[in-house]
Amino acid sequence: EPYLQVDFHTEMKEDSDIAFHSRVYFGHWVVMNSRVNGAWQYEVTCHNMPFQDGKPFNLSISVPPDKY
Protein backbone atom coordinates (compact mmCIF):
# COMPACT_ATOMS: atom_id res chain seq x y z
CA GLU A 1 0.00 0.00 0.00
CA PRO A 2 1.53 3.36 -0.99
CA TYR A 3 2.34 5.80 1.79
CA LEU A 4 4.37 8.92 2.48
CA GLN A 5 6.48 9.02 5.64
CA VAL A 6 8.25 12.00 7.23
CA ASP A 7 10.47 11.54 10.30
CA PHE A 8 12.38 14.25 12.20
CA HIS A 9 15.19 12.35 13.94
CA THR A 10 16.99 14.00 16.83
CA GLU A 11 20.36 12.61 15.65
CA MET A 12 21.87 11.37 12.40
CA LYS A 13 21.41 7.71 13.39
CA GLU A 14 18.66 5.38 12.13
CA ASP A 15 17.75 4.25 15.67
CA SER A 16 17.71 7.74 17.23
CA ASP A 17 14.67 9.31 18.84
CA ILE A 18 12.08 10.76 16.48
CA ALA A 19 10.71 14.14 17.53
CA PHE A 20 7.95 13.95 14.90
CA HIS A 21 6.77 10.99 12.81
CA SER A 22 4.02 11.24 10.22
CA ARG A 23 2.82 8.57 7.81
CA VAL A 24 0.10 9.22 5.23
CA TYR A 25 -1.76 6.13 4.04
CA PHE A 26 -3.25 7.52 0.84
CA GLY A 27 -7.01 7.14 0.66
CA HIS A 28 -7.25 6.06 4.31
CA TRP A 29 -5.71 8.05 7.18
CA VAL A 30 -2.72 9.95 8.61
CA VAL A 31 -0.75 8.65 11.60
CA MET A 32 1.46 10.85 13.83
CA ASN A 33 3.71 9.86 16.70
CA SER A 34 7.13 10.35 18.31
CA ARG A 35 9.77 7.94 19.62
CA VAL A 36 11.52 8.72 22.91
CA ASN A 37 14.32 6.55 24.36
CA GLY A 38 13.47 3.87 21.77
CA ALA A 39 9.78 3.69 22.75
CA TRP A 40 6.92 4.91 20.57
CA GLN A 41 4.62 7.36 22.35
CA TYR A 42 0.85 7.91 22.02
CA GLU A 43 -0.18 7.52 18.37
CA VAL A 44 -2.62 10.02 16.88
CA THR A 45 -4.67 8.88 13.87
CA CYS A 46 -6.52 11.36 11.68
CA HIS A 47 -9.25 9.90 9.47
CA ASN A 48 -9.93 13.24 7.76
CA MET A 49 -7.83 12.48 4.66
CA PRO A 50 -6.57 15.68 3.00
CA PHE A 51 -4.79 13.73 0.21
CA GLN A 52 -6.28 11.85 -2.74
CA ASP A 53 -4.77 9.04 -4.82
CA GLY A 54 -3.25 10.34 -8.04
CA LYS A 55 -3.72 14.01 -7.13
CA PRO A 56 -0.65 16.25 -6.77
CA PHE A 57 -0.07 18.18 -3.54
CA ASN A 58 2.53 20.47 -2.03
CA LEU A 59 4.29 19.53 1.19
CA SER A 60 5.83 22.42 3.08
CA ILE A 61 7.63 21.91 6.39
CA SER A 62 8.72 24.91 8.45
CA VAL A 63 10.87 24.34 11.53
CA PRO A 64 12.06 27.41 13.46
CA PRO A 65 15.67 26.88 14.63
CA ASP A 66 14.77 27.60 18.26
CA LYS A 67 11.99 24.95 18.30
CA TYR A 68 13.80 21.79 17.17
Swiss-Prot record:
Q: Which UniProt keywords apply?
A: Cytoplasm, Lectin
Which protein are we looking at?
Galectin-10
Q: Which InterPro entries match?
A: ConA-like_dom_sf, Galectin-like, Galectin_CRD
Q: Give a yes or no for keyword Cytoplasm in this entry.
A: yes
Q: What does this protein do?
A: Regulates immune responses through the recognition of cell-surface glycans. Essential for the anergy and suppressive function of CD25-positive regulatory T-cells (Treg).
Any GO MF annotation of the entry: carbohydrate binding
Judging by the UniProt lineage, the source's domain of life is: Eukaryota
Tell me where in this chain the Galectin domain is found. Answer: 1-68
Q: Which SUPFAM superfamilies match?
A: Concanavalin A-like lectins/glucanases (SSF49899)
Q: Where in the cell is it found?
A: Cytoplasm, Cytosol; Cytoplasmic granule
